[in-house]
């Protein structure tokens, strides 16, 4: 995906700011604008949490277990495991712990609050061989918040992004062993960011609000060689977002000590052109390929696995184009595009999970996973996407209230491991370090079968 910020002077403002790309160190936060997610949820800025039942087994076997409707998202071919007409709704709450300390001892925690990741699915069996499904999910999203006066404010202060995905799918049961599925994703992104902005010798800050629509596609295949063994292969395409927005620049504190936006009074006569600008940003979300397997070892025990590849190597930089670069620099020949460099690599997720059926009403499950971060060079880690490798530990349960209604519950702990430093991208000098990059995920959902 991509996000770009266009800017035009506020009427009557003809003064100029002697700043160039410093104005948009703010783009570190904007990286999330295109699709976004917090590093604590999944590698890069992608959310995995589209199923509470799946959460309990660390998403092993996603889309082909058949115990909820999330096949609509993970692998549409798996809808053939869902008889009749069914409906699902639920949410995962993500609680982050992003404790950071700079070299000078300034501390903060970017965890904003508990962030909901909702899901809603509908499936309908049209005949013996065809199924239709529709899903509404938030596959990308994040929320971080640092105090405005923290030392590394130019690495990002506040960021909140949500991407809503509307995903119709169809599935065809070719025979008893092979099924295929396909769908289209229509996505809406809304993003809000704040970052510190150097303004001459003073300290200012900028705020971006942007939104936009884009679309992509998904495919899935499920192969069942025996009654107890299934494999799935699913693909989700790259999605390119073009988001229009508004950027406001201002001094961090006005004469009264209160943060200001617009054109602060304390800049009069200093040659600063602070105000509101139109903007546009673009960014590409990656291709994703997922391989899953599930085996009914006994009538009570199911074992599942997942391997997921995400093409984050395609996310090399975040280009931001704006006439404001020329206006603020006071140079009509300077570039109107700034690129925030990331130089990511492809990432991988590996998980294993188990389900144990205690009786007709209760199933319990657990899972473990290891996720490889897309951050290839640690000096390109940002405060708003503080990504690192992570370990998954999950537990969950399903309660079948009756033959029509079930409730699913899940809990996961994600532990960030490896390098957690923040660095100067030019010199490589370490500026600070995250003491923690952890998350707790708690989810609940229900599934209702109409017939």
Q: Predicted segment positions?
A:
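Outer-membrane beta-barrel porins/channels
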Residues: 41-58, 62, 84, 100-107, ...
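N-terminal, post-signal-peptide region of Sec/Tat-exported proteins
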Residues: 67-94
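A generic, lipid-embedded transmembrane alpha helix
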Residues: 96-98
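Gram-negative bacterial Sec-dependent N-terminal signal peptides
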Residues: 15-41
């Amino acid at each position: 995906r991509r996000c770009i910020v266009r800017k035009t002077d506020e009427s009557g403002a003809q003064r100029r700011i002697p700043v160039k790309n410093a104005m948009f160190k703010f783009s570190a936060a904007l990286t999330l604008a295109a699709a976004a997610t917090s590093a604590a949820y999944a590698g890069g800025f992608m959310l995995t949490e589209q199923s509470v039942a799946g959460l309990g087994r660390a998403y092993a076997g996603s889309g082909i277990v058949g115990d909820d409707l999330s096949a609509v998202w993970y692998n549409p071919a798996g809808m053939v495991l869902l008889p009749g007409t069914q409906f699902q709704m639920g949410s995962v709450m993500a609680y982050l712990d992003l404790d950071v300390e700079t070299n000078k001892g300034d501390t903060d925690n970017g965890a904003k609050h508990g962030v909901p990741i909702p899901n809603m699915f509908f499936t309908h069996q049209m005949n013996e061989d065809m199924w239709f499904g529709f899903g509404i999910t938030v596959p990308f999203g994040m929320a971080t918040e640092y105090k405005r006066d923290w030392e590394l404010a130019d690495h990002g202060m506040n960021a909140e992004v949500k991407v809503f995905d509307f995903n119709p799918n169809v599935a065809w049961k070719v025979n008893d062993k092979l099924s295929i599925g396909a769908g289209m994703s229509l996505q809406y992104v809304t993003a809000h960011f704040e970052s510190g902005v150097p303004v001459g010798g003073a300290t200012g800050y900028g705020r971006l609000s942007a939104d936009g629509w884009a679309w992509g596609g998904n495919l899935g295949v499920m192969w069942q060689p025996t009654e107890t063994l299934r494999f799935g292969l699913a693909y989700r395409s790259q999605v390119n977002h073009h988001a229009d927005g508004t950027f406001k620049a201002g001094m961090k504190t006005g004469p009264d000590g209160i943060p200001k936006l617009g054109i602060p009074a304390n800049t009069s006569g200093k040659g600063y052109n602070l105000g509101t600008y139109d903007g546009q940003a673009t960014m590409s979300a990656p291709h994703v390929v997922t391989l899953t397997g599930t085996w009914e070892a006994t009538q009570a025990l199911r074992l599942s696995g997942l391997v997921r590849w995400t093409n984050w190597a395609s996310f090399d930089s975040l280009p931001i184009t704006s006439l404001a670069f020329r206006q603020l620099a006071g140079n009509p020949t300077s570039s109107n595009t700034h690129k925030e460099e990331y130089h990511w690599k492809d990432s991988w997720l590996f998980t294993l999970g188990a389900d144990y059926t205690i009786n007709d009403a209760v199933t319990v499950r657990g899972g473990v996973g290891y996720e490889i971060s897309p951050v290839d060079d640690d000096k390109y880690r940002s405060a708003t996407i503080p990504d690192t490798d992570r370990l998954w530990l999950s537990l969950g349960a399903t309660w079948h209230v009756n033959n029509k209604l079930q409730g699913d519950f899940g809990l996961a702990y994600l532990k960030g491991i490896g390098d957690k430093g923040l660095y100067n991208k030019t010199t490589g000098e370490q500026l600070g370090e995250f003491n923690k990059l952890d998350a707790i995920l708690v989810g609940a959902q229900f599934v209702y079968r109409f017939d």
